[in-house]
A protein has these predicted regions:
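Long, charged, mostly alpha-helical binding arms that flank functional sites
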Residues: 1-69
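Basic, alpha-helical terminal appendages of large translation-related enzymes
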Residues: 43-156
Length: 156
C-alpha cells in the first residue's frame, strides 16, 4: 500500500468470497479452540493463510498495469491478513501486534472479538477513519514481523 494506495488502506471492499472465507475460518478456529484443539485450530489458519497467499500471488500478477485490479487484490489480501492476524494472536502475540501497529490500528480494537467479522472499512469506521484516510506505517525492505526462535537459526 505504500506506493499503490499512497500509504493508506485500499478503498475497495474485499470480494464477497474473501469475506465468506474469512468468516468461515474464524468460526472454524473458534469451534476448535473452544474444544481445546489448538493443533487443528492453528492448522485451519495455516491452510487459510496459504490459500490467501496464493490468491494474492495470482491476483497481483494478473493486475500488473491495472491500478484498480491491483487495489482489489490488495483489498482482498488485507482482509485476509487481518483475519490471520486476529486468529494467530494467541499463538504469536508480539508478531501479530507488529502487524496491527503497521496497519495503523489500535490493538484493543483490532484484537477485539466483537469486531472479528468486520471488514477493513468497518474497522476503520470504529477507529474514526476511512480506508482513504487511514494511514499505514511504512515498512523497510525485507521486514520480518515474526522473530525467529534460536532453534530456527542455522549455525555456521
Amino acid at each position: 500500500t505504500q506506493s499503490a494506495c499512497a500509504g493508506h488502506l485500499p478503498t475497495l471492499a474485499a470480494h464477497d468470497d474473501v469475506m465468506a472465507a474469512c468468516r468461515e475460518v474464524t468460526l472454524r478456529f473458534e469451534r476448535l479452540a473452544h474444544g481445546f484443539d489448538a493443533h487443528n485450530a492453528l492448522a485451519a489458519v495455516d491452510a487459510f493463510a496459504r490459500a490467501a497467499n496464493k490468491r494474492w500471488g495470482e491476483a497481483s500478477k494478473a493486475a500488473q498495469g491495472d491500478d484498480v485490479a491491483y487495489e482489489q487484490a490488495l483489498a482482498d489480501a488485507f482482509q485476509a491478513l487481518r483475519t490471520v492476524t486476529l486468529l494467530m494472536h494467541p499463538a504469536t502475540p508480539s508478531g501479530c501486534e507488529k502487524v496491527c501497529e503497521h496497519l495503523g490500528f489500535d490493538s484493543n480494537l483490532f484484537f477485539d472479538w466483537e469486531h472479528a467479522f468486520d471488514s477493513i472499512a468497518q474497522l476503520c469506521q470504529a477507529q474514526g477513519t476511512t480506508p482513504a484516510t487511514h494511514q499505514t506505517v511504512g515498512l523497510p525492505p525485507r521486514f520480518d514481523f515474526f522473530e525467529r526462535h534460536p532453534s530456527q537459526i542455522r549455525q555456521k
